[in-house]
Amino acid sequence: YERTGKIAFEVGAFTNIGEDHISPIEHPTLEDYFASKLKIFSQRRFAVVNLDMDKVDRVLEAASRCERTVTFSLTDERADVLALAIRNGDCGVVATVRTPRFTRDIVIPTPVKFNVSNALAAIACAEALGISEEGIVHGFEGVFVPGRMELYPSVSGKILGIVDFAHN
């Protein structure tokens, strides 16, 4: 569990916790996995935390040793980075995002809500690092992750295939 033990990160982001890595070859229990994930905050300067996840109080406690914590959420008004509105657009999802420095629409070129949460995490990381508003917006232009919610409509448009295997 010390795969990144010698790396000093500027930002450590904790997006969620689930049972997807519980197995004989990874983590034997959810608690073991959770404790392992919390270690990221001992190797970082800034913490980014999703207020929408389970066990958020424990995550915030672990993040408190960081120089600064930036939070994000799809729904929690207390978040530093918040999606005020989410709607479908021509090129993906359009989220009206509020940060400590700006409020504006950002096009997220992936078609599902959980990717909005991932985008908010990226925006929170950029916020922690002081990246400009334009730099953040520009960073989403042309984003494409192979194998992550790739849509393949049939010629008729009546059938939609979805490829989504890029979990980790």
Question: How should these model regions be labeled?
Answer:
Residues 2-161:
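Acidic, Mg2+-coordinating active-site environments of NTP-dependent enzymes
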